[in-house]
Amino acid sequence: MPNPADRVRELEFKLGSVEGPFPGHDLTGQARCINGVLQAFLGPVEPGQKIEAVPGSNSNVPLWILGSSLFGAQVAAAYGLPYGFASHFAPQALDDALATYRANFQPSDQQKTPYALIGVNIIAAETNEEAEYLATSQQMSFANLVRGDRKLTQPPIDDIDTYWTPEEKMRASHMLNFSIIGDADTVKRGVEALLARTQADELMIVSDMYDVDKRLRSFEIIANVLKD
């Protein structure tokens, strides 16, 4: 992705500020520019250097490539960077992208071996029925996306089929293909199956729910599952 002017200040803020409280693990600073400029800005200031990242200089924030296609996988492999795949909303090319990334990976100073992160939607609750109910908020959000009508997350409803058309259901469900919805046991089985399939090194978990307390509880259940 190019760096339009209106993103420069945002990138400067992210590249410097996120590394402070979360050293060594910056996903918001995923590489938008792949020609080495960011690596130079995040390293020590060299004599005669005319442009300095403030904050950011000498932070050595790790760069990532985030993608949803084979192109991103090829770029991450060529530059020896960690690769994050946006399978939480664009899962179509996941398997091919991971295979491409791993097969073509070139070691770099930052990363000696391939390191893959994948996005996954997980909505966990005390029961499968409650989780399915809570998941309707995210399903409505994707139906609205299909309609071109972006809205804030809506409260869950009893019957999602009253909200979307068959075509919207098909398209939204395809985008949400990488979703695990259920109680702790269901989530555990789903995560194990996903890791067995992808051999991912890390998961980026999205738990998009209307009720903040329910969302926090979802993450608690997920955390307990992953500890086991």
Task: Give the role of each language-model region.
Residues 1, 63-66, 83-86, 114-121, ...:
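Hydrophobic faces of well-ordered beta-strands that scaffold small-molecule active sites
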Residues 6-20, 79:
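Acidic/polar active-site rim loop that often engages polyanionic ligands
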Residues 3-6, 89, 122-124, 209-211:
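Active-site-proximal loop/turn and secondary-structure-junction residues that shape catalytic pockets
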Residues 15-52, 93-199:
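An alpha-helical appendage that flanks or caps ligand/catalytic pockets
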